[in-house]
């Protein structure tokens, strides 16, 4: 059960949306469609994520497995400018210092064992700035991010960094 919870947490880390922007990540006035959580919400940013999901080789009563530790990554607008960075526990900090904490409220089906799942996060923002008022974040269209093989006794305690790309869409 512990292994499943850890795997699900890790799977929930990626995203991309079908909303347009003018290159700076600001989304033209559109409302979200798709999952129930974002239906009717307004998409305001759509940034691409590049980074790594970090896992540690751990052991429990079922054997060795890769335990999710944290993401490391940056969120870029369509011109490649850094807009935010991913933080521990699904947090995000924007370039202006505003930040949000997030918790998973919805996840999509597995598209591939190697790819993170689509996930919807409910958020709490802190500080004034570009993330102020963001209520939801959806991570979509992830490529990579998941370990493909289990770890062994000789790897216990070692870290594994799995590259990923995704799209993060922010909603008010």
Residue ranges, per PLM feature:
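Positively charged n-region of N-terminal signal peptides that target proteins for export
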Residues: 1-4
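C-terminal motif of bacterial Sec signal peptides marking the signal peptidase cleavage site
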Residues: 14-15
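Primary mode marks residue(s) on the alpha4-beta5-alpha5 output face of response regulator receiver
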Residues: 23-54, 61-172
């Amino acid at each position: 059960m512990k292994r499943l919870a850890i795997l699900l947490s890790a799977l929930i880390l990626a995203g991309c949306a079908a909303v347009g922007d003018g290159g700076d990540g600001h989304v033209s006035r559109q409302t979200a469609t798709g999952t129930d959580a974002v239906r009717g919400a307004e998409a305001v940013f759509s940034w691409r994520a590049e980074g790594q999901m970090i896992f540690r080789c751990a052991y429990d009563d079922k054997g060795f497995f890769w335990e999710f530790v944290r993401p490391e990554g940056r969120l870029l607008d369509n011109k490649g400018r850094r807009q935010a960075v991913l933080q521990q526990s699904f947090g995000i900090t924007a370039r202006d210092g505003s930040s949000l904490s997030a918790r998973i409220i919805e996840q999509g089906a597995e598209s591939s064992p190697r790819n993170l799942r689509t996930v919807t996060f409910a958020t709490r923002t802190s500080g004034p700035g570009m993330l102020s008022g963001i209520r939801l974040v959806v991570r979509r269209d992830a490529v990579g991010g998941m370990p493909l093989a289990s770890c062994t006794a000789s790897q216990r305690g070692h870290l594994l960094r799995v590259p990923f790309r995704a799209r993060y869409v922010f909603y008010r």
